[in-house]
Amino acid sequence: MSVYNPNDADFAFTIGIEEEYQIVDPETRELRSYITQILEPGRTILREQIKPEMHQSIVEVGTRPCRTISEARAEIVRLRGAIAGLAARHNLRIVAAGTHPFSSWMQQEITPDERYRMVVGEMQEAALQLLIFGMHCHIGMPNNEVAIELMNVARYICPHLLALSTSSPFWMGRNTGFKSYRSVIFSTFPRTGIPPTFHSASEFERYVQLLINTGCIDNGKKIWWDLRPHPFFGTLEFRVCDIATKVEECLALAATMQALIVKFYTMFEENTTFRVYRRALINENKWRAQRWGLDGKLIDFGKRKEVEAKALVHEIVELVDDVVDMLGSRKEVEYLLTIVDQGTSADRQLRVFAETNDLKAVVDSLMNETIEGVPVMTFDTESSVQTAHS
């Protein structure tokens, strides 16, 4: 059982989290295209852990590979605190939400980089309006064959994770009626959504090579599925989620992804398995998740009936119950039940708007929740850390 123990040298199922934050002006509450001013001092402090994105109003961070969710907690808190502090030097704030409630993509500046120029050249307006913010979670894999086997099974759970993460109900000043409008916007890109199944790692590699040979992509990173084997990191990357507004929500999702992967792997080792369903069926659940979040019903394809999404979250917590203590993630996984009780970020945003009829109040709430429990770093003029405060 050493392969399942985070304290063992052979442990493979590490966690890596990437988050994409909004850079926001606290006076106007609009997005600000300010990544260049944040990036230079940010690289001094965070080195490769801070990156630009296509729009200059986005800043991306990534944790180091973590064996436990406790390590990931320390990383996420440190990274959010550092980025919040770097933004504060310019009287700016950060927000973790899948879309900005009212800022327009037409007012955003594109990062001057050849890679982004090529994306815009190919994707045109679909790229320009891709003003969305996600959370990606990498789970380490023992080898490529295991990655494909686990992807085939874990596809089924992607809509459930999306429902738990929803944080993008507004788009360009409108209530979209969706809990995750980010997912709708991203669907305009090719090679997105629920992945197909593959019989082996070699079949997947032949598929990628075919796309490269026919000029569709230059490498596997341009396969943007909700769940994919990362072409360079040796991980299975969950990409389905809106960015979680609160740190606790982020950690609950990441811990659940790790626990599910470990659970599925133990089932393989015990010669039991989880049924693999068609992409067309899983897509039905994904549409429901992005539309209604936890307030809707998802389809239990094994039982061939609709089930309240909230009830299915309880089933997920029960499914991984026998692995969470070994992984040290019981508290974080059980926080899913708090999300069920209190709602997602999308639910809270909609409540604030219902109470105030003011999208600026929604941004204020998001700014506060993004750094809830996070010590914000302060920096001197040379960008070295001075202090941190909550």
From Swiss-Prot:
It comes from Chloroflexus aggregans (strain MD-66 / DSM 9485). It is an enzyme of class 6 (ligase). One of its GO terms (molecular function) is glutamate-cysteine ligase activity. It catalyses: L-cysteine + L-glutamate + ATP = gamma-L-glutamyl-L-cysteine + ADP + phosphate + H(+). This is Putative glutamate--cysteine ligase 2. GO terms for biological process: modified amino acid biosynthetic process. InterPro entries: GCL_type2/YbdK_subfam, GCS2, Gln_synth/guanido_kin_cat_dom, YbdK. It comes from the Bacteria. HAMAP family: Glu_cys_ligase_2 (MF_01609). Its EC number is 6.3.2.2. The keyword Membrane does not apply.
